[in-house]
Amino acid sequence: MAKAEDVAKFMIDILRIKAEHGLDDGMTNLRLQKLMYFVQGYFLAEHDHPLFDEDIEAWKLGPVVPVIYRKYSRFNKDILEDEAPTEFALTSEEKELILDVLSKYGKYSTGYLVELTHTPGAPWAQVFDPGQNKKIDTESIKRYFKTQKKVSTTEEKILKFSQKSYLRGKTGHIILPEDSYEDWEEYVRV
């Protein structure tokens, strides 16, 4: 089982790299908390056990993993920075699910992620009591996420791409639509 800290560091590192390439704004503590919740939820739904053992609580702005919140609280609303990238104690299966969740939810604003976690009937909404920071039961998270549309896996995305019509050169390489070649007779349609 992974540690919440490894999950958080992995997500921070992924979004830091995307931000360096102008593909993301970076990770704030509030955004991290919401993404931790979604990752835990989808992992529970898919594997019937938690990705990490640390509790998730219902705070004013949505689900929070307190140990992770405290670790990064010094950043306030600023972009999180962590130590230099390290090896993460995560399996390839865990990393893949985290990447799939980031692919689905990482594109949304923090405000929208907060709204999603506040959906009526969602685990946060069932236990939230202002100022109480009540624990959100793992079983309720699992039940809720089993009713949600599954995140597309990397494997499914590759399969979807492979089913599209494209040209393949005689040597087997794929010719993408924007490629232009003078002698199309050398190529076969797949």
Where in this protein do the model-derived segments appear?
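Domain-edge interaction signal
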Residues: 1-190
